[in-house]
């Protein structure tokens, strides 16, 4: 398995992919973990899945330093995990943490105490305690 510096969970989305491209441009080896196989295939083929100014150029420059996958085992072998997921709201405008907690249930066996975990989401302070 190829070594990466950073794993971006939700990495094929409108927040995760541009962040991954920026990190790649700073010579970080980035793995993008996502569940959208269609978007993963586009990224790995050098196709930007959405409009992002300068995105196509960044994606195709030094492509060996970025890889998109739906294989969760890549999370385990990185120093930094950045979680980029949205937080939907209920009809009462309160955060709905259902998907957030579901994601971390899936991730928990693939995280370790030596990793830096960054939550890049619209959750409020104290949500992760």
Regions found by a protein language model. Give the residues of each.
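Short, flexible coil/linker segments at domain boundaries that flank nucleotide/cofactor-interacting
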Residues: 1-2, 112
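Conserved N-terminal Rossmann-fold NAD(P) cofactor-binding segment
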Residues: 3, 29, 35-80, 86-94
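Conserved hydrophobic helix-helix packing surfaces used for dimerization/oligomerization
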Residues: 6-7
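Glycine-rich Rossmann-fold phosphate-binding loop(s) that bind the pyrophosphate
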Residues: 11-12
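N-terminal Rossmann-fold NAD(P) dinucleotide-binding loop
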Residues: 16-17
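Gly/Ala-rich phosphate-binding loop of Rossmann-like dinucleotide-binding domains
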Residues: 20, 24-25
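Rossmann-like NAD(P)(H) cofactor-binding subdomain of soluble oxidoreductases
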Residues: 89-129
């Amino acid at each position: 398995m190829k070594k990466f510096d950073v794993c971006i969970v939700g990495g094929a989305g409108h927040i995760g992919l541009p962040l991954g491209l920026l990190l790649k441009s700073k010579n970080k080896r980035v793995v993008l973990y996502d569940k959208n196989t269609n978007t993963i295939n586009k990224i790995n083929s050098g196709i930007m899945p959405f409009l992002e100014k300068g995105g196509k150029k960044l994606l195709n420059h030094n492509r060996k330093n970025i890889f998109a996958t739906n294989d969760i085992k890549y999370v385990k072998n990185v120093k930094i995990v950045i979680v980029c997921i949205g937080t939907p709201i209920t009809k009462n405008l309160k955060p709905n943490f259902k998907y957030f907690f579901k994601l971390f249930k899936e991730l928990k066996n693939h995280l370790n105490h030596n990793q830096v975990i960054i939550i890049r989401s619209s959750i409020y302070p104290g949500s992760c305690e």
